[in-house]
Amino acid sequence: MSTFAEAPAGDLARGEKIFKTKCAQCHVAEKGGGHKQGPNLGGLFGRVSGTAAGFAYSKANKEAAVTWGESTLYEYLLNPKKYMPGNKMVFAGLKKPEERADLIAYLKQATA
């Protein structure tokens, strides 16, 4: 399952658990909230990488100009450093396709 289109359907509850255990230490997912070590993910879908106001992004993140959506997040979350070399995110990624799909399902709801 190398693409989001081939991934299993995401589960919102499992995605929330993944967010709380693997993402929440560095990110919040609420529109209008502040940033932590990583940027606030509120309004993530449709946003271009490196553009959340008030966060000091890496040059790589700003220059990548990735528009975040299901497919781009699915690829990015597999291996963030490989997808966007030079970005600040220290997270190694989610290797299981179902975990990436679950997290994306949660993020779609939580960041809207």
Curated annotation (Swiss-Prot):
It comes from the Eukaryota. Pfam families: Cytochrom_C. GO terms for molecular function: electron transfer activity; heme binding; metal ion binding. GO terms for cellular component: mitochondrial intermembrane space. The keyword Iron applies. Transmembrane segments: none annotated. Keywords: Electron transport, Heme, Iron, Metal-binding, Mitochondrion, Respiratory chain, Transport. SUPFAM superfamilies: Cytochrome c. It is found in: Mitochondrion intermembrane space. Gene3D superfamilies: Cytochrome c-like domain. Heme c binds at C23, C26, H27, M89. Binds 1 heme c group covalently per subunit. The keyword NAD does not apply. Belongs to the cytochrome c family. Electron carrier protein. The oxidized form of the cytochrome c heme group can accept an electron from the heme group of the cytochrome c1 subunit of cytochrome reductase. Cytochrome c then transfers this electron to the cytochrome oxidase complex, the final protein carrier in the mitochondrial electron-transport chain. This is Cytochrome c. It comes from Chlamydomonas reinhardtii. The gene is CYC1.
